[in-house]
A protein has these predicted regions:
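Noncatalytic, solvent-exposed loop/strand surfaces
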Residues: 33-487
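Bacterial N-terminal signal peptides
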Residues: 18-33
Length: 487
């Protein structure tokens, strides 16, 4: 149990069907506008103003899914907690359309990606105020086969002067960050004959700087293409789909030209992670059935490891977690967690959860990627909203040190030895990142200062974002910006 005098508010349980479908949904998020501190309008004209860096603010930008290093860890120091009776200062809020992805923040801009009235919408906001700088739209006809909304799931990525988006139906686009001017676009799902996954496209793009040859910056995405006649009669029978040489594809950021493609694995909802193993850059891509160890320079697959539940209606969505030469995979439908070593470009299994283990005694992540701190892994275990637990697990043994109920399938990031946790039901918590006990420093339901209504409505499935001392959190229909260092 956590040390806290406050009582958790209960959240509505999701239906059985929703539970089965859920897994894809988190790696994602969306965003819109209108602030409680200041109002911004969709009708503002696009601007070509040059992005301004918030260099006077502490810590770093957050230009991609799970931050600059893809592990959900912020370099911010001096987090001001507890927040006091009134909670943290809300700088601005903005309304959302459909979608499940969070913002990316860099150079003074926050880019948000959602769907409104049949169009996928990309907007660039001033990170400090929420003011709309520019907006671009694309028509979309994507329909989720399980009834979830049709907005984007994949988080935009800011790469230098560019922003790259990957829509739910597979439209990959690159635009100038300063004014939204289109640089190139590729209808990936059409060009590579992708059979739609249960929830569309969900894994976010990653960027890699080549060190040899042309030394291009590459955007690497999970594609999972198939033969042109590969569509099964029943669109839910994804077990009948075969891949064809485009599991992962790398494109030149500036031109959109394909640089390499590799593997016949199908796509998952797990965003790949770049890491250094024994002085070599490697990409860890947890595809639909296997984890791949890839040379990002060439796309060469060095090794693979199978880790997925046998159940047809299962997916993997959490990203791999890396510590030194070890990699942790965690899913909730089958085997749970496995710890691998990377030795000479080969995977070596070091431990796995015991057979028939349950989420109450092991780490079985649904979609939220756990964070590592002091040889402990913090995150949510469990498949269903009502019985999910927030836990601290030992990195090497998998043993649970403590567990806390009532937060649903929550997400977290690490900031200055603290965990900022966003519950599925909209509650915001700060916990001490300790194996000894779950010590809650502060918890709050954010309220609109004018109406008293909750700012974060469930479901809250996107991971928090921490950029330049600001915290960005989203619920259904709204993004909220909070100042973490305001005293």
């Amino acid at each position: 149990m956590c040390v806290s005098s406050e009582v958790l508010s209960s959240g509505a349980l999701l239906s059985r069907v929703a539970v089965r479908c859920l897994v894809a949904v988190l790696v994602f998020g969306s965003i819109c506008e209108i602030g409680c501190a200041q109002s911004v309008r969709d009708s503002e004209q696009p601007s070509s103003s040059r992005p301004q860096s918030l260099e006077s603010r502490p810590a770093e930008d957050w230009p991609a899914f799970l931050g600059p290093t893809g592990n959900g860890r912020s370099g911010l120091q001096g987090l001001v907690v507890p927040w006091g009776e009134q909670g943290p200062r809300v700088c601005w809020t903005t309304d959302l359309g459909e979608g499940y992805c969070g913002p990316s923040v860099a150079k003074g801009f926050a880019v948000v990606f959602d769907r409104v009235r049949g169009k996928e919408r990309l907007r660039c906001l001033k990170a400090e105020t929420g003011r709309v700088v520019w907006e671009k739209n694309n028509l979309t006809s994507y329909v989720d086969m399980f009834g979830y909304d049709g907005g984007p799931r994949s988080t935009p990525i800011i790469v230098g002067d560019y922003v790259v988006t990957y829509g739910a139906a597979g439209l990959l686009e690159c635009r100038l960050l300063s004014n939204g001017q289109l640089q190139w676009k590729i209808q990936v799902s059409t060009d590579f004959h992708v059979v739609p996954n249960f929830f569309g496209v969900g894994a976010s793009p990653v960027v890699y700087q080549q060190t040899a040859g042309a030394q291009r910056q590459l955007i690497i995405v999970q594609v999972g293409g198939s033969p042109s006649n590969g569509l099964p009669a029943d669109p839910q029978r994804l077990d009948l789909v075969k891949g064809l040489d485009s599991g992962l594809v790398a494109f030149d950021v500036k031109t959109g030209k394909e640089v390499w493609r590799t593997s016949s694995e199908l796509a998952s909802y797990s965003t790949p992670v770049l890491s250094d193993f024994d002085g070599k850059d490697r990409l860890l891509a947890w595809m639909r059935d296997q984890l791949l160890l890839v040379d990002p320079e060439s796309g060469a697959v060095k090794d693979s490891f199978s880790w997925r539940a046998d159940e047809l209606f299962s997916v993997v969505a959490a990203s791999p977690v890396v510590s030194g030469d070890e990699v942790l995979l965690s899913e909730t439908y089958g085997g749970g967690s496995v710890l691998l070593g990377v030795e000479g470009d080969s995977f070596v299994e070091r431990r796995r959860d015991p057979p028939r283990s349950r989420h109450r005694n092991s780490l079985r992540c649904h979609w939220a990627t756990p964070v590592l701190h002091d040889d402990c892994v913090f995150g949510t275990t469990g498949r269903n909203s009502g019985d999910a637990l927030f836990v601290c697990a030992d990195w090497r043994t998998g043993e649970l040190y403590w567990k806390e109920s009532g937060l649903g399938r929550s997400s977290c990031v690490l900031v200055d030895d603290f965990l900022i946790v966003l519950s599925e039901f909209g509650e915001l918590l700060v916990m001490k990142a300790s194996r000894d006990t779950c010590e809650i420093i502060h918890r709050i339901d954010l309220k609109d200062s004018r109406t008293g209504d909750a700012l974060l409505q469930p479901p809250c499935w996107a991971a928090p974002v921490v950029a330049r001392g600001y915290l960005y959190v989203r619920g259904a229909g709204k993004l909220v910006c909070i100042d973490l260092v305001d005293r």
